[in-house]
């Protein structure tokens, strides 16, 4: 639509990104599997887990906290925008509070890295998922930041299922949804 309405400058790059996206997601999910297993073992007993990201990836953080951690696993969680981290949320950082950070490949990467640097200095239970490690860059410099949420969603699907397995708490179990009027 953008191409038809306005003449999108990076239309060909975006088309190429879409052409290879499935392969990038598949490889990213395979690459992520060992980390997902470690993450699940390290966090299976957690009562709270914060997820941080910025840019287009913030929506992935929001979905992970709301739909996966709170709805499916009953873990208290909060999506934190990396650009807002130093406006209050950084005050909860200590050696016990777990954070999952999605580091993007686009213009906002510097904000993600700044937050990660702080977490590594003052925290301990930090899991960093770096888009560069998942091959997001191969999608093309002009469009990778827009397609990266799709890759992170695929990767976090692995993480959520491994966490569910480690907790012996299926992602399909609900307390209220589909059971009581609301």
What are these regions (language model features)?
Residues 1-182:
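A SIS-like phosphosugar-recognition module
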């Amino acid at each position: 639509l953008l191409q038809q309405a306005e003449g999108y400058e990076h239309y060909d790059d975006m088309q190429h990104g879409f052409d290879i996206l499935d392969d990038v997601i598949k490889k990213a999910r395979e690459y992520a599997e060992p980390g997902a297993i470690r993450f699940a073992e390290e966090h299976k007993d957690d009562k709270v887990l914060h997820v941080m990201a910025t840019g287009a990836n913030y929506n992935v953080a929001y979905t992970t906290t709301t739909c996966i951690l709170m709805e499916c696993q009953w873990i208290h969680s909060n999506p934190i925008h990396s650009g807002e981290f130093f406006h209050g949320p950084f005050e909860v950082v200590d050696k016990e509070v777990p954070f999952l950070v999605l580091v993007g490949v686009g213009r906002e990467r510097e904000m993600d890295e700044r937050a990660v640097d702080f977490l590594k200095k003052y925290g301990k239970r930090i899991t960093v998922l770096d888009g560069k490690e998942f091959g997001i860059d191969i999608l093309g410099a002009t469009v990778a930041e827009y397609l990266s949420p799709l890759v992170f969603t695929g990767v976090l699907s692995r993480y959520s299922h491994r966490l569910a397995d480690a907790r012996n708490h299926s992602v399909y179990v609900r307390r209220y949804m589909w059971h009581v009027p609301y």
